[in-house]
């Protein structure tokens, strides 16, 4: 598949510069995290294109916002993480989509870990001072150490081979997960952060989770071998929402088919390139 107009270095440079200057960061952990990862992507684009000025500007903006999240100033109402010791969890302020009840932590915090990993690779000062805090955010959803302060692999069910998004698992249809792509990104971020911090145990945990999550996504969400879903009854190309009661073509926030499709592909990321290379035709699938 090729973009019919081809790659334009001039247009890409304009996009890099524009986003670096105007890109915003939401005030909650989901939209704030997405803004962080987008800025991390743009700074790598600028670096690869040799645009030193844009790269430095993007890196500085990303660094400032991540430091704000990883520190607390008495009296501030948002942009910080609070530890809930009774639950062994971190809650980012402001929470969203019920993240205060531990929903979707790997989705939300995976953005922070991914963006932090990129910045740690490019900024030694940030790596040394704030890398350990990024590690704590990663441990919230994927604690690879059997310790008392965090559950072991909070969001991952090793037996099922994939993550669950429900923090308490008390929905009427049991626990489940919509966005396979955000789950994969969360593991990729741990893998990258482990490499950046030279933390072998963390790196291996990221590889472990990434391997399980991608294989489960291929098996249960996309059913590549067509051996799990009865497509004579299920009239959709793949599963959008996998719960303990089966497959579903719905999301928690919309019934529009465009969201059922895109929630398995976004955010566009190098982390997904290898996995989704087998699904390029499906990526461009048009709902009819």
Which residue stretches match the model-derived regions?
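Interhelical loop regions of multi-pass alpha-helical membrane proteins
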Residues: 160-165
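Generic detector of multi-pass transmembrane helix bundles and their immediately adjacent loops
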Residues: 104, 126-130, 138, 178-181, ...
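Inter-helical turn/loop segments and adjacent helix faces that build the functional surface
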Residues: 46-50, 119-129, 190-204
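Well-ordered alpha-helical segments within folded domains of soluble proteins
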Residues: 31-44, 105-120, 178-192
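Active-site neighborhood of glycoside hydrolase catalytic domains
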Residues: 134-136, 180-213
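Ser/Thr/Asn(+Pro)-rich, low-complexity disordered segments
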Residues: 1-106, 134, 144-148, 152-159, ...
